[in-house]
Regions:
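Mid-to-C-terminal alpha-helical segments outside catalytic/metal-binding sites
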Residues: 1-13, 19-48, 225-237, 245-279
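Active-site neighborhood of phospho(di)ester-bond hydrolases with catalytic His/Asp-centered motifs
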Residues: 7-10, 51-53, 81-82, 110, ...
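Conserved, mostly hydrophobic/aromatic
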Residues: 11, 41, 67, 109, ...
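Active-site environment of divalent metal-dependent phosphoester hydrolases
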Residues: 15-17, 56-59, 87-89, 116, ...
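Alpha-helical scaffolding within the catalytic cores
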Residues: 30-37, 61-69, 92-96, 158-161, ...
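Active-site gating/metal-coordination segments in enzymes
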Residues: 47-48, 58-156
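Short, electropositive alpha-helical surface patch
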Residues: 61-77, 165-166, 191-202, 253-257
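Catalytic pocket-lining loop regions of alpha/beta-barrel enzymes
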Residues: 104-108, 121-237
Length: 279
């Protein structure tokens, strides 16, 4: 692909460990392969995407190896974000950092509080934030609701990110899912901290959902209010959470926002290009 990058999906997943996604009822029509993803990206006009290593592999080493292979086969269209679980202990965190040292294509780190029992400001994560600072890469943090009922949302409030954003002011931090349902709380954390961003991933359901139109209208309203609270669109990122969300649906949320065209363009790609160093 040549030419300027206009659309970047900052949040999607592809893994054989997520094969059961078809059985969840989220996307029964999906071609859950790399070719299927690239085809859906083309149809939605998405130039690049950020592939987030899933949290479901037998080991983080397995998940990283799989994600690296997918990225290497994507003809430069995917960027790699890896993950780590601090509850596995200091040695496991050190081992993962050592793996990242041998991963030159690493573009970011994703944390899954709620799915794993820790807060974003857990001191066991300090080496991870310090590593992100050294590599000059962002840390993406799950915030808001969890996909499964066993997740613990006490760990996922956006306000829990404020402390670490202050302690690691030079580390860019992304509040995934805009903290939904605590979108106003996420907006405050973004407004207060110049190193904090929020993405729009996972905010909508499949169009077949009976209340989809009303949900989409409410979501647009809440995201618009959040952007107004922040006072700028420059730290808001488009993301889908594919395969859970159809890419065209996720793009449509952004294009429907009552914003100047330059702000919609920034959310769809310009901000991500700056954050992830895409050219």
């Amino acid at each position: 692909m040549t030419g300027a990058i206009s659309r970047v999906d900052t949040h999607l997943h592809l893994s054989r460990y997520w094969r059961e996604i078809k059985a969840t009822g989220y996307r029964n029509d999906i071609d859950y392969t790399l070719n299927g993803l690239l085809h859906e990206m083309d149809a939605a006009g998405i130039d690049r995407a950020v592939l987030i290593q899933v949290n479901d592999a037998p080991t983080v080493r397995d998940g990283l190896a799989e994600a690296r292979g997918i990225v290497s086969e994507s003809a430069g269209r995917l960027r790699l974000v890896s993950t780590v679980d601090p509850t596995k202990g200091a040695e496991a965190v050190s081992d993962q950092i050592a793996l990242w040292d041998r991963t030159p294509e690493l573009a970011g780190i994703k944390l899954f509080p709620g799915y794993n029992p820790f807060y974003p400001h857990d001191r066991r994560l300090d080496p991870v934030y310090e590593y992100a600072h050294r590599r000059r890469i962002p840390v993406l943090i799950h915030t808001g609701d969890t996909m499964d009922a066993w997740g613990l949302v006490k760990y996922t409030r956006p306000i829990e990110v404020d402390e670490v954003a202050v302690r690691f002011r030079d580390v860019p931090i992304v509040l995934c899912h805009f903290g939904n349902p605590w979108i106003d709380e996420a907006a405050e954390v973004v407004y207060k901290n110049p190193n904090v961003y929020a993405d729009t991933s996972g905010l909508l359901a499949h169009p077949s959902y009976p209340l989809f139109d009303r949900m989409a209208e409410l979501c647009r309203k809440r995201v618009m209010e959040a952007i107004l609270m922040v006072g700028s669109a420059e730290r808001v990122l488009y993301g889908s959470d594919w395969p859970l969300i159809d890419l065209k649906v996720a793009v449509g949320l952004v294009t429907s926002l009552d914003l100047p065209e330059r702000d919609r363009a920034a959310i769809l790609g310009g901000n991500a290009c700056r954050l992830f160093g895409l050219t």
